[in-house]
Amino acid sequence: MNIKDEHIDSVCSLLDQLVGNVSFKNLFTGYGLFHKEETMFAIWQNKKLYLRGEGVLAIQLTKLGCEPFTTNELNKRFVLSQYYALSDQILRSNRLCRKLIILSIKQILEQKLECTLRKLNRLKDLPNLTIKHERALIKVGITNVAMLREIGAENALVELKKSGSGATLDFYWKLVCALQNKNSQMLSQAEKERLLKKLNEVWRKNGLKGYRKLDDE
């Protein structure tokens, strides 16, 4: 049966209406459904939509009546245990379906970020950071990526502030985005306001004076 001609276009269109930026690619086990052309969150095969989920999300899908992907009829050895066929209960509710898809996409992106950061060791190899930033962090005892991830951007800036090692807001933006594997110049004004509030809370808990506004250096 030609699944694409009969189903995949409409399936893709429906999912696009729910979360936006959905496309599909022909796979040897059916069709992969992608968000923003790079994050494969679902598979369409044999008139069933399989959503990717692991851990807590997998448990949630199972409780909602979703069956795990077992075998591919064309390739009996091909198994995708982290994909679950969405139940009628989910498919009847656009709101629930959208919620689960968003959770799946978020989980995949978090796993990719985890994998990327795990491969890095030197601080200067992170986005936005240079050898100058690395040296400043090493001076306060943060010697590698794993330690920075553990302590977090806010507490790292606390240590920099206490040691007088250039704890600026620009450094903070760079640290936050480095741990998200993205360019700090892409931060919006609203994101900076939210992060500033978070930073001030941590600083005050550590007996430091917080920033009153974004340009209050």
Swiss-Prot record:
Q: Does the keyword Zinc-finger apply?
A: no
What InterPro entries does the record tag this protein with?
TfoX-like, TfoX-like_gammaprotbact, TfoX_C, TfoX_N
Which Pfam family, an example, fits this chain? TfoX_C
Q: What upregulates it?
A: Constitutively transcribed, further induced about 50-fold on moving from rich to starvation medium. By CRP and cAMP in starvation medium. Translation increased by depletion of extra- or intra-cellular purine nucleotides in starvation medium. High levels of purine nucleotides by contrast decrease its translation under the same condition.
Describe the disruption phenotype: Does not bind transforming DNA, is transformation deficient. Loss of expression of the competence regulatory element (CRE) regulon required for development of competence.
- Could you mention a single GO BP entry for this protein? cellular response to cAMP
* Source taxon at top rank: Bacteria
- Recite the UniProt keywords alphabetically: Activator, Competence, Transcription, Transcription regulation
Which Gene3D superfamilies does the UniProt record give? 5' to 3' exonuclease, C-terminal subdomain, YgaC/TfoX-N like chaperone
- Described purpose of this protein according to its UniProt entry: Required for DNA transformation. Positively regulates genes required for DNA transformation (late competence-specific genes) in association with CRP. Required for expression of the late competence-specific gene, com101A. Required for expression of the dprABC operon.
Q: Which family does it belong to?
A: Belongs to the Sxy/TfoX family.
Protein name, UniProt field: DNA transformation protein TfoX
Q: Which gene encodes it?
A: tfoX
